[in-house]
Design a protein with these regions (language model features):
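OB-fold and OB-like single-stranded nucleic-acid-recognition modules
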Residues: 1-111
Length: 111
């Protein structure tokens, strides 16, 4: 069994499935190590509401749930949750293990 094939549900890793949104940015397709102009989706940088663990979740969507400008202008915390979110373990070029997260969709929560 390969560790990279494991899918870890987000709910199994974090007590609370609601996260504080800190940033939104697009992510693009790469071909042969080169970034293309083909938009694959948006990356949501979040912080866990309990122990303040920081991580990002990629969502394959051509439209973000909130723009970076709207997030920046907000005077209060913005909370999000993710549908069918999971993490995958991968090894970096220097040999350390990391987890990348992705989800089917993201949803804004009422404050």
């Amino acid at each position: 069994m390969r560790v990279s094939k494991l899918k870890l549900p987000l709910e199994a890793l974090f007590e609370n499935a609601n996260f504080i949104l800190t940033a939104v940015s697009p992510y693009y397709e790469y071909r042969e190590g080169e970034k293309t102009e083909h938009l694959l989706g948006y990356k949501y940088e979040v912080v866990e509401d309990g122990n303040f663990e920081r991580f990002s979740v990629k969502v394959p969507s051509i439209k973000p749930i909130i723009t970076a400008e709207m997030l920046e202008k907000s005077s209060s915390r913005i909370f999000v949750t993710f549908e069918d979110a999971f993490g995958r373990i991968y090894q970096t070029p220097v040999g350390s293990l990391e987890i990348s997260f992705s989800a089917v969709s993201a949803k804004l929560l009422e404050a």
